[in-house]
């Protein structure tokens, strides 16, 4: 098999990708047998290409799977940990905009009764 491009793989369905993955794994095992039995140099150099192709297929499968999960959980209240934004531990625990703006009943009353003073500037 020739070198596989990731952009060609993205259009394929999951079943096709899994079938291609199986084919590549079979080919890799055949190449490894050829290596042990003393195969041609062209077959030995092909091992690397097939390994990288397997990695590309697996990468595309995992990326599409994660993309579909993101679509599924979009707008839901709870998301799996690996779909949430990473950030730092401190940033994840920080109050959000809504929580920062909240005031107690007592503070709301104080703000209402003693509003900010406005001063006129003498020209």
Curated annotation (Swiss-Prot):
Its protein name is Large ribosomal subunit protein uL29
Q: Which organism is it from?
A: Xenopus tropicalis (Western clawed frog)
Q: Name one GO biological process term.
A: maturation of LSU-rRNA from tricistronic rRNA transcript (SSU-rRNA, 5.8S rRNA, LSU-rRNA)
The record's note on quaternary structure and interaction partners says:
Component of the large ribosomal subunit.
Signal peptide start-end: none
Q: Superkingdom of this entry's organism?
A: Eukaryota
Fetch the InterPro entries from UniProt: Ribosomal_uL29 (IPR001854), Ribosomal_uL29_CS (IPR018254), Ribosomal_uL29_euk (IPR045059), Ribosomal_uL29_sf (IPR036049)
Q: Keyword check for Transmembrane helix, yes or no.
A: no
Recorded hits in HAMAP family, A to Z, give: Ribosomal_uL29
UniProt GO molecular function: structural constituent of ribosome
Role description: Component of the large ribosomal subunit. The ribosome is a large ribonucleoprotein complex responsible for the synthesis of proteins in the cell.
Per UniProt, subcellular location reads as: Cytoplasm
Q: Which gene encodes it?
A: rpl35
The primary location reported for this protein is cytoplasm
Q: Name one GO cellular component term.
A: cytosolic large ribosomal subunit
Q: Which UniProt keywords apply?
A: Cytoplasm, Ribonucleoprotein, Ribosomal protein
Give the family from UniProt: Belongs to the universal ribosomal protein uL29 family.
